[in-house]
Amino acid sequence: TTKILDAIKSGQSQTITPEYTYTAYRREKDEIGDTYVEISLSKQHMWFFKDGQLLVSTDVVTGNHNKGWDTHTGVYAIMYKERDATLVGEGYNSHVNYWMPFYANTGIHDATWRNSFGGSIYMNDGSHGCVNTPYENAEKIYNNIEKGVPVVVYN
């Protein structure tokens, strides 16, 4: 702001580089990059792009809507990844083979206890906020994703 005011006061034409509180993951092309996870809550579907190529497209089950455990929308990043994790919370203690958290205790993981994904399952039988994913797709994402990869969650 000071630079802009100084430029105005000087009365001369100037080029000023803006200063940002937050910046995009990158500035060239698009801001999110070529490797990212996209999750549509309304479609109960997840896509994983790596180097611009669609690697995984899968139905998922997200947070239980009727219990108020909706998966949070926003833009996040994979915090870390872990094999053979135990997820513990109110009323559950679940082993998962592939755990990729992206926001607090919310993440992408396999859900071997489910035999179907997608549709309206999340309305009454959804997760506590995580993205339940079929085993083979969670495995493929896990084997191809790194810490810091953007995760975009939207309705």
Predicted feature residues:
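Surface-exposed, secretory/extracytoplasmic low-complexity segments enriched in Ser/Thr/Asn/Gly/Pro
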Residues: 1-67, 74-76, 80-93, 98, ...
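Exported/periplasmic cell-wall-interacting domains
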Residues: 70-73, 84-155
